[in-house]
């Protein structure tokens, strides 16, 4: 039985897993959700940005995800994503999406969700390091350090969004300092 002809889909822009968004995963989900909505003739789509777990992630950090959904909703492709994002924010989408770096450790597969090293490294108790098995300090320390540098560079050209990149640069610097302490 059909529930109703009047169905709305509520997708998500991943900002509820700590201090850092996951626009990369949101992109993957948006592509599949858009296909499913179109195949099932669902005309109304909303994108949510939940503030679970304390709402640490800034709302504007998911602008790439929102632009992806806009492109899919209005054009059904991402051909003009970069141009439209640059017009809307003044930054390239490629630069802006670097805001995800604290969650994108070298050993993590690209298509996983819910893995949030930005949070578990930050909150790891150095006297009781139960999460050490989830990190590889020899890879993760330089990753976080490089991420801090990259985000600091982007901050200089980010205009009104500079605070997002400054916050993430500082977070990555802390994570780089802490990841090998346990």
What is the role of each PLM region?
Residues 1-182:
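Substrate-binding groove of N-acetylhexosamine-processing glycoside hydrolases
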């Amino acid at each position: 039985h059909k529930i109703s002809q009047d169905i709305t889909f509520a997708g998500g822009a991943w900002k509820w897993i700590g201090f850092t968004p996951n626009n990369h995963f949101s992109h993957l989900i948006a592509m599949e959700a858009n296909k499913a909505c179109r195949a099932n003739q669902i005309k109304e789509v909303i994108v949510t940005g939940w503030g679970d777990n304390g709402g640490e992630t800034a709302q504007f950090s998911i602008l790439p995800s929102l632009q992806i959904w806009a492109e899919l909703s209005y054009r059904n492709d991402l051909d003009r994503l970069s141009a439209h994002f640059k017009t809307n924010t003044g930054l390239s989408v490629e630069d802006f999406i670097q805001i995800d770096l604290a969650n994108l450790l070298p050993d993590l597969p690209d298509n996983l969700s819910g893995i949030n090293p930005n949070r578990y490294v930050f909150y790891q108790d150095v006297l009781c390091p139960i999460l050490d098995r989830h990190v590889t300090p020899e890879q993760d320390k330089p990753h976080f350090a490089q991420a801090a540098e990259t985000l600091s560079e982007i901050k200089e050209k980010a205009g009104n969004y500079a605070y997002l990149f400054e916050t993430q640069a500082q977070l990555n610097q802390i994570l780089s300092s802490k990841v090998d302490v346990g």
